[in-house]
Amino acid sequence: MTELDAQKIIDFIANSKKQTAVKVTYKGHLNGRIPTSIQNFSNSDFGILYGDWSDIKPLLSGLNKKDYLIENNARNSAVPLLNIKDINARIEPGAIIRDQVKIADNAVIMMGAVINIGAEIGEATMIDMGAVLGGRAIVGKHSHIGAGAVLAGVVEPASAQPVRVGDNVLIGANAVIIEGVQIGDGAVVGAGAVVINDVPAHTVVAGVPAKVIKQIDEKTENKTALIDALRSL
């Protein structure tokens, strides 16, 4: 996958039209004609509107507040959520994935995961519950990012390097990987570790700050083996 350049992300956010998207369910007669910028599912005196608050608000001025319901979860948002309908991956309810994220085949995104703009998730990699992938974080193939783990994001400054996690890596629950750190292929990061330096391939690190405690051996491989069946679609 091609890495999304930081400056491109900055330009995308800076130049995007900021949106306060709302859904409005109403009864009665609206004040004025519904503009084409609004999705309109209405009959003569009842309907549902989808659009930007600045476009919809004037239409409600003639209604009693008891006659409409506004649903809204963002204000002046610069980045929409990713359209996930056709992604060849398992994405569970409650995951928050912003636009400009790349998700490879057979990846798994669990409930409550938060994945920011520019992040990349490799083939058959699992992002567990509540994990956070910051801007531009890159995870390779067949890895596991544990529940509550954080891969720190780097969008600004534009010259900063993102977190990069290799293939076949296991990152334990609630571990934190600091900006710019690289995790080598086949490494294991212990639960709760705070990783401030690069991790060599095929090593185990743990602690705060994380330090190498041993090389990967057969016993470790057996204890940390990932299950392919969880990644099948």
UniProtKB/Swiss-Prot annotation:
It comes from the Bacteria. One of its GO terms (molecular function) is tetrahydrodipicolinate N-acetyltransferase activity. Keywords: Acyltransferase, Amino-acid biosynthesis, Diaminopimelate biosynthesis, Lysine biosynthesis, Repeat, Transferase. GO terms for biological process: diaminopimelate biosynthetic process; lysine biosynthetic process via diaminopimelate. Pathway: Amino-acid biosynthesis; L-lysine biosynthesis via DAP pathway; LL-2,6-diaminopimelate from (S)-tetrahydrodipicolinate (acetylase route): step 1/3. It catalyses: (S)-2,3,4,5-tetrahydrodipicolinate + acetyl-CoA + H2O = L-2-acetamido-6-oxoheptanedioate + CoA. The keyword Coiled coil does not apply. Its EC number is 2.3.1.89. PROSITE patterns: HEXAPEP_TRANSFERASES. It holds the Pfam family DapH_N. The keyword Repeat applies. Catalyzes the transfer of an acetyl group from acetyl-CoA to tetrahydrodipicolinate. NCBIfam families: DapD_Ac. Belongs to the transferase hexapeptide repeat family. DapH subfamily. PANTHER family: 2,3,4,5-TETRAHYDROPYRIDINE-2,6-DICARBOXYLATE N-ACETYLTRANSFERASE, ACETYLTRANSFERASE. This is 2,3,4,5-tetrahydropyridine-2,6-dicarboxylate N-acetyltransferase. It comes from Oenococcus oeni (strain ATCC BAA-331 / PSU-1). The gene is dapH.
